[in-house]
Each structure stands twice: as structure tokens, then as C-alpha cells.
Amino acid sequence: MTIRSPEPEVKIVVERDPIKTSFEKWAQPGHFSRTLAKGPNTTTWIWNLHADAHDFDSHTNDLEDISRKVFSAHFGQLAIILIWLSGMYFHGARFSNYEAWLSDPTHIKPSAQVVWPIVGQEILNGDVGGGFQGIQITSGFFQLWRASGITNELQLYCTAIGALIFAGLMLFAGWFHYHKAAPKLARFQDVESMLNHHLAGLLGLGSLGWAGHQVHVSLPINQLLDAGVDPKEIPLPHEFILNRDLLAQLYPSFAKGLTPFFTSNWSEYADFLTFRGGLNPVTGGLWLTDTAHHHLAIGVLFLVAGHMYRTNWGIGHSIKEILEAHKGPFTGEGHKGLYEILTTSWHAQLALNLAMLGSLTIIVAHHMYSMPPYPYLATDYGTQLSLFTHHMWIGGFLVVGAAAHAAIFMVRDYDPTTQYNNLLDRVLRHRDAIISHLNWVCIFLGFHSFGLYIHNDTMSALGRPQDMFSDTAIQLQPIFAQWIQNTHAFAPSLTAPNATASTSLTWGGGDLIAVGGKVALLPIPLGTADFLVHHIHAFTIHVTVLILLKGVLFARSSRLIPDKANLGFRFPCDGPGRGGTCQVSAWDHVFLGLFWMYNSISIVIFHFSWKMQSDVWGSISDQGVVSHITGGNFAQSATTINGWLRDFLWAQASQVIQSYGSSLSAYGLLFLGAHFVWAFSLMFLFSGRGYWQELIESIVWAHNKLKVAPAIQPRALSIVQGRAVGVAHYLLGGIATTWAFFLARIISVG
């Protein structure tokens, strides 16, 4: 009989000193590729260098090494975020009027940048109130700082320094986990352990820690600020933490300590953990006692979730078992095989995460205005508009990224031999039905939604307003949306008897809340104009999905090009001699999808901007009369294309066009410059590569004549490179134009 040594109890999950630290590679551009490492012969080299520098798949086939590189890069990413955040806090500490704003947030505007007087640029320092001259900011940091209980600039300095120290730790961790103690592949594939730690640690303890900070620091400080106490008189955070009597003066249940908790008498704590709903009438933000309660509850939920998965003790869920048990009567093998995909293809994993995070970011955009989480956020219209726009764009990019990485997974990581009759295989087998149906939906939505507008424009031009679709003629009321609004407005009386208001004032039923004579929020009426533009949203979103999904489902093969998987993720055409096979690569679908994403988000932020100015934002007189910024013109004007052009784009562009010579002049220059960037993109998108190559050769001839020819031969951009440069400038130009248009407008009138 053979005697084996006992199995080691502890698995070895890291490798020590796998790769020595060396700066030599920094001096070799393209060290990761044999071809690129030789250096440039033509100008194509620099483009290929940019395209492949972060494409770890192309550097090596070793999944363990790729995983380590990605893991290490995550720490670098966190370091960059912390450095950026530190800069924001430092600006708040060094260059801002935060303390002045804190003492009078309704009259003083936030500013954290003062322009130096160089060649007249100090014109950008507008008067933001309280005798401070600077650029008005719309990031929402001031409101966030107030909500977290920051009362002076020293605290901002300390936080900024702390963030820099943490950034240094992250950079160290990135180096350490690649060069000193690199995790083995098994570590990255241990999904149950990862779920437990991320759920319980990051989300559970993170939320619990934030709830603790809110209860012990934010709530008392904000309670005193709301009562009008001077920020300089308010005790410092550590005093509240160390001296329970201070807290007990504001929240009497603190005097009882933990007794109510251990005697299950939790309702005693209802003075600082509330469930009120609606907004605080002093600040126009959510009740901070509601948000503290929320974070406590979320923390508990995630702590439970972090104990659900099976690791060393043989109890709990196994993700593989859950997936393989997931079969229905009509779904074949169900989710069998997906576990192997998600533990060996980081592109597949990333695609799912981007799709969910993108959707979540868009949900955040909609909640930031309908349930404004920070004090005085709702009445800072510039910040409201900026936060909505920012989160919509970010969400759009993340969703397109999801499709991009799903397609890369299909091309590089999908193994058809291991995926038989599971849901992924079944979707791929009936992809023609999916795409042709989706195409039909797009055509239907496009013709009908656009047709309603065309009808209205025609009737308007013919002087027949009674034949238009509008709230005053032929009504197309969004009855389902109105029903949802109504249900939510009156639900709390049945579902949450102690709540004083519904989750959001936008649902209806409640009164409006005004802060300092400005509307914070009120019930948002929906009518025919919203019904029309909603169907344009449906149309643009479905077309975006059509393009992206077709790119994923046909990434490996199609009737036109059965061997597409061999050509890779990006290729210009299927070789010479096969006409009509250009723009079919998975990369090209992402490229085209980006334009439709841009269409979709543009119409959403235009809808939001005009709707809020027309029906929500405005001032309120002593008699209680509300004057909206554009006087409620959305319902009538937004029913025609001409109305959108005349009463939204043209009417509201006057501020940015006339901004020269004022503190908003930077937006005028940006508006002009970003239009040029956008137009520049068309030069790449509508160009033929041969045209430029001919031009280049003529210019090279002239250089040769003068004996100043370069050693590196100039080359026209490849087709794919040209498209990449084109779409980048198209999006940059379009987004910066919109940014300048929105901010010049809302800072002037808001």
C-alpha cells in the first residue's frame, strides 16, 4: 500500500515574488509585443501602441497572469480616483467659499475656483454672493459635505490629505499584489469567498460604518445647522462621539444607551431612525434621519447576504449548483455551463457588471432629482441639471461597454463545444428571430413616434391647432404613467402608516416644497407632450439595443461571413475581392452603437432640462404663486419638432450665445470650440483612406525634395483607427457643446 503525506489543510493561494520589479520596461514602448517592441517604421506604430497597451489578452494567453494584471490595475484605478477626490476636497479647503455658503446656502452660490488675472481671464470670476468672486460650481460637493457634517475648511484639508495617503496605499497594493504576493488563479475563481467578502465587507460594513457616521456626526450637526446655529458654534465631530450627553440633548433616546436594542424595544430609537418619506422643508433634501435608517437597514441586509455562500464550512449556497439547477420546462439545459464562462472569461464577467452598473447609474440619475439626498441640492438648479446629465452619459457609456465586452467574450473566449443547448446556445441559435423582431419593433416605434410629431408640425403649419395631438386638442394622455404616479402618491397611507409623505413629491398628492423662495420639488404633471417624447425615448433605446445586440449575437459568425471569429474582434472588411463586407466586425457594432447611445441620452437630457424648467423649477411669491422659469410652455411647445427647435434649442441657447464679455464667457467659447471638435470628427467619419494616403505621398515627395524627409514613414490612419478617432471627437464635441449650452442657460436663469 502507498502511504501519502496528509493533504495540507491550508491551500496555497498566493505566489511569492513571481515577477521582479524593474523600470527597464518603462523605457521600452511596446515591450508587451514582439512587433511593437522593434520600434516604429511608420506612424501606424503609435496607433497600434495605444490600441494594444491595455489589451492584456494580446500580451499573453496565461489566464493567471492576465488576472493578476487586471487585479493590480484595479488598485491603480482606485489610486487615481482617490487623487482626484483629494483634489476636489483640497479645492474646497483652499479656494472655496464653503464656510460662507454653509452659513447662507439660499443666497450664496457654491464656488471653488478663482481664476488668476492673466490676460483678462479674471472676467470668469462671477459674483456668487457674500462678497466672493469665483467660478460657480455645479458638482454637488458642497451639499454632500454639509450632509456628511463638515463644518469648516480644516476638515476638508484633513480629508484631502487622508485621501492622498490612501491613494499611496493603493499604489503600493497594486505593486505588491503583482510583484511580491500575486494571487493564484484559484483565488480569482473562488466566487463564493469573493461574494461573502465583498457583500459583508464592502457593502455590509461599508453601509453600517456610514450609518454610524450619519447617526453620530451628520445628524446632530445638520439638526443644529437646520435650526440656524452658527457653524462655528457647533461642537466638532469628535465631541459628539465622545460625549453622549450632547447627542442626548438632540435625540433623547441616546440617554438610554443600548438597553432598548437588547430588550427588543427598537421603536425607542425612532427619534433618529425615522421612516417619514418626503423632504425636509428647511433644506429641500431627504430627511437625513430617513437616510441613516436606510443605510442601517441596507448594512444589515448585506451582512446577512455575506454569509450565504459556501466556503470552508460546507454550508450555504454554491453558485455553480444554483446555475445548473436553473432550468425551466422550455429552456433545455438552462444555465449549465455559465459558471465555467464566468470563472474563465473576465470579458463575460465585465459585460454583466457593466450592464448592471450602467443601468444602476441611470437609475441614480433619476433619483437624484426626484429624491434629492443632500440639503439644498433641490434648489441648486445648475447642480441638479449637471448631476442628471452626468449620470445619464456615464450610464450610456457603461451600457455600450457591456456590449463591447460581451462581443469580445464571444470572439475570444466562447467555446461552442462546451455550450450545448443551454440558454446562451439557444439564444444564439434563434438569433435571427430575435434580431428581426427587434428590427420590426424599431421600425414600428420610429415611424409611429416620429409620425405623431410630423402630423403635429403639419397641422401647426396649416393653422389647424384643433387637429393636433396636444393637451388642448386631441389628447394622448400617458394614462399608465399617471396611474403609477397616483398609486405611489397614495400608497404610504396603506403600506407605511407612520410615513408622512410618499417616497417622492414628484408622484403627486403632496404640496410643493419651496426653500428660500425657490421651488425644491412639486408633483410633476405628465401630458401629451411627455407621451410623445417618451415614445422617441423608446425608439432610440431600442435602436441602440438592436445595434449592440446584433454585434454580440453575430460576433462569431453570420450568413455573410461564416468564419468571422477567425477575423477577430475588429477588422475593416472580409479581405479584398469581397464587396459589401465592411463594417461587420463586432467592433464596428460598438462604434455604431455609440452614435445611437448619444442620440438616446441627448433626447433624455433635453426632455429633462426643458420639463424641469417649464413645470418644476421656478420662484414662489409671498402669496404662494409659482412662476416657472419657462412658464409651463413644455406641454404646448414640445408637441412639435418646430417647438423643440424654436422654444428649447434656439430660445435657451441665447444665454450661451450672448455670454461673451460676462463671467459665463468660457461657456460661449466652449460652445463654439466643441462645435468645431464635433465638425472635425466628420472629417474622419466621411473620409476615404486612399484620399489621405495620396495626399501624404505628395507631401512626403515635397519633404524629400527639400531633404527633410522623416525616418518614420507617415501613413494614413487605418479604417478602424479613423473610425475610432471620429467617434471619439463626435462624442467629445457633442457632449461638451451640450454641457456649455446647459450650464450657461441654467446659471443665468436658475
UniProtKB/Swiss-Prot annotation:
GO terms for molecular function: 4 iron, 4 sulfur cluster binding; chlorophyll binding; electron transfer activity; magnesium ion binding; oxidoreductase activity. It is a multi-pass membrane protein. One of its GO terms (cellular component) is chloroplast thylakoid membrane. P700 is a chlorophyll a/chlorophyll a' dimer, A0 is one or more chlorophyll a, A1 is one or both phylloquinones and FX is a shared 4Fe-4S iron-sulfur center. This is Photosystem I P700 chlorophyll a apoprotein A1. Chlorophyll a binds at residues 683, 691. Keywords: 4Fe-4S, Chlorophyll, Chloroplast, Chromophore, Electron transport, Iron, Iron-sulfur, Magnesium, Membrane, Metal-binding, Oxidoreductase, Photosynthesis, Photosystem I, Plastid, Thylakoid, Transmembrane, Transmembrane helix, Transport. Belongs to the PsaA/PsaB family. The keyword Transmembrane applies. Its EC number is 1.97.1.12. PsaA and PsaB bind P700, the primary electron donor of photosystem I (PSI), as well as the electron acceptors A0, A1 and FX. PSI is a plastocyanin-ferredoxin oxidoreductase, converting photonic excitation into a charge separation, which transfers an electron from the donor P700 chlorophyll pair to the spectroscopically characterized acceptors A0, A1, FX, FA and FB in turn. Oxidized P700 is reduced on the lumenal side of the thylakoid membrane by plastocyanin. Chlorophyll a' binds at residue 675. It is an enzyme of class 1 (oxidoreductase). It comes from Angiopteris evecta (Mule's foot fern). HAMAP family: PSI_PsaA (MF_00458). The PsaA/B heterodimer binds the P700 chlorophyll special pair and subsequent electron acceptors. PSI consists of a core antenna complex that captures photons, and an electron transfer chain that converts photonic excitation into a charge separation. The eukaryotic PSI reaction center is composed of at least 11 subunits.
